[in-house]
Amino acid sequence: MKKTTLGMALAIMSAMPSMAQQNGLTDTGKSKYAVLTSTPINAVKWTDGFWGERFGVFSGTSVQSMWETWQSDKSHGFHNFLVAAGEKRGRRHGPPFHDGDMYKWLEAVASVYAINKDPELEKIMNRFIGCIVKSQREDGYIHTPVIVAELNKRLAELEKSTGKEATQEEIDNTVVGTKVGTAKDGAFGNSLNFETYNLGHLITAGLVHKRATGQTTLYNCAVKAADFLCSFYENNAEALARNAVCPSHYMAIAEMYRETGNPRYLKTAQGMIDIRGMVENGTDDNQDRVPFREQYNAIGHSVRANYLYAGVADLYLESGEEQLMKNLTSIWNDIVTRKMYITGACGALYDGTSPDGTDYKPDNVQKVHQSYGRPYQLPHSTAHNETCANIGNMLFNWRMFSATGEAKYVDIVENCFYNSILPGISLDGKRYFYTNPMRMSDDLPYKLRWPKERTEYISCFCCPPNTLRTLCQAQDYAYSVGNKELYINMYGANTLSTKIDGVGDIEIKQETDYPWDGKIKLTITRLKGKKELTFKMRVPEWAKKAVATTGDGRIKVETDDRGSYMTITNEWKKGDVINIDIPMEARLIEANPLVEESRGQVAVQRGPVIYCLESNDLNGIDIDNIAIPLDAKFTTVETTIDGSRMMALETEAINRAEKPWTGTLYREVGTEKNKVKIRLIPYYAWGNRGKSEMTVWIPAGL
C-alpha cells in the first residue's frame, strides 16, 4: 500500500543556516545538519605529482577532445542544440540523455576554468551556453528531443502555409510551448526520456559555472529549469515521480536551495523523495516499489540507486530527518559489507532478477539491469561496475562525510577515485570504459555488451563526461572545513587558499609523492598573526599506523587507529610545518568466503591503489596459470605507461605450467610448477598498452 500523500510531500520547514558559505562544489556552509563544508571551487590547485600530472591531461587534452566528439557526426550532441536553438535545420539524433551528458561535460570545463582561467575554455563554454539559452522554453523546460520535434513541426506548418522556406527571422520567432505540467506539452511523457536526469545536470552545471566564473547566464537557465521542476511537482507530482530515472535532479534541487535559500526548492526536494511512494507498479530496478523510508538495502540499477542515495543524503543535510539517516546508514552498510567491489565499484549484474521484489512467484519476478545483486554476488569477468555507478557511490559517501565527519566515508571516496573512476579514462585522456570488470579474458564463451577496450565514443555516452567532470573536480574533495578545523581528506601535491571562520585567510602548501609515498609535508604559507586552528589529518583504513609531527618537533601524534583522523590543535603562524608519515607496504587482500568467485584468491593493494596482473607483463605465460604465494615479498618499481609515471610491484610468483583448458570442464590437479617473476600495475592503468587480458584476483599459492 502506498502510504505517502501529496499533502505529506508538501509539508516541510526550511532549515536554518549554521556555517559560513564557502562557494564550494557542494556548498553545505549554511546547511543546518552538516558538520563540514567544502572549500571554494577555486581554492585548491594541484601543483605536481600524481594529481598534477593527471589534471594536466584532463585540462589540456580531455575537455577539448570531448568537445570535438560532441561536434562530430558520431555523437550529434552539439548538432542537436544547434537545431533546437534555430541555428541549423535538421532532425535530432542520438539517445535522449545526450543533453545531460553535454551538461556534465560543460561542468567539467567550468571546473577546469575555475583553476586555470583559460580564455579558450571560456569561448567554448559561451558557444554552448548561447545555444542552451536559445533552446530553453520560457517556462524553463528544455529537452532537445521535444524542442526539436515541436520546432520542426511548427516550421513545417509555417512553410506549408506560406509555400516557401522559413527565413532565419521566422525561425528565431518560432516559440515552442510554454505551458507547465501536462504531457501533451511534451514534458515527462515517457520516463525513459531521461528528462529529470537532463534537467538535474543542467541545474548542477549552472551552479558550478556561476561559482567558477562569477557569470550568471547559464545559472539563470538553471534557475528556470529548477523552477520548472518545482512547478511540475506542485501540479503533477505523480507524473514526476514516475520520471525519477537516474535522478540527478535530487542533488541539483538541494544545491539550488543552498545557493538561493529559497524554501520552495527545499520543499520540492523533500516532496520528490516522498512521492516515490506514489508510483504504481514500481520496480526494484528503479527503487520505487516501496517508499524510500521502507528501504534498508541497496537494490536495483546501481546508477539510479547511488544517485538516489546521494540525493537523500543532501536532503538530510538540510532537513535533519532522522529516519532518512537510518535508511542511508543501513543501505551504506549493505553496500560496503556485502555488495561493493574491492575497488569501490558498484553494480555486479549486467542483467538479472531482483532478489527483493518477489515472493518467488514466477509471475512476480522483476527484471533488473546494470544493478546490485544478492549479498556477496560479486562476479569478476561479468562485473558491470558502470563508471557512473562508481561516481554515484563516491557522491553518496561524500555527503555522508559532510553529515558526520567520519573518515570511513572518505576512505571510500578515495578508493573510488583511484580504483573505479580513474580506470574509466585512458592515460592519454581520450578514450573511455563504460564498465570496469575485475577480470578480462580473450576467450569468454559469451559476448559482453560493451567493448573490451576503451573507446572515444559509444552511443551510451553517459560515463565519459561524468568521469571527466568528476576527475576535473578531484581537488574539491581534498579538504573540508569545520568549526576552526581544517580536514585533510585526500593527499596530493597542491596549494590551498581559503578562509576559515575564527581564523581568517589561510594558505597551505602540501608537498608529497602520494599515492606512491606516504610522506606528506604541510606548510602554512599565509596566515595573519597567530591563530588557533585544528588540523585533522586522515589516517586511511589501509594504514597500519600514521605519525604527524610539527616542524619544530614540539608536537607529535602517533596512531594505529585506522580509518580515523589524527588531530593537532595549536596556535599557528605563517611558516609553520606539519610532517605526516603514513607507511606504505604492499599487502594481500582476501574476500569474505561468501564471495564465491574470490575464494582461494588474493588481490594486491599498496597505499590506496589496487593492483592487477596484465598479460602484457607475462611474456606469453597464461594469466590463468599464475598464483601468488601468501608470503610474497613485493618490490616497488618506478615505470611509465603512455607517458604517465606510476609505481609497479614485482614479486616472485608460481607458474603452474598447466595445459590449456580447451574442451575441458574438470581435470586432476597438476603438480608441475616453477617460479616466475611477475609485475603488477595499478588497476586504473590496465588496457593502455593495446588489447590485453587482466585480473585483479589471483589464485593464492603455497
Where are these regions (language model features)?
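Solvent-exposed beta-strand/loop surfaces of large extracellular or lumenal domains
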Residues: 543-569, 588-594
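Low-complexity, Ser/Thr/Pro/Gly-enriched N-terminal "stalk/linker" regions
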Residues: 21-101, 126-177
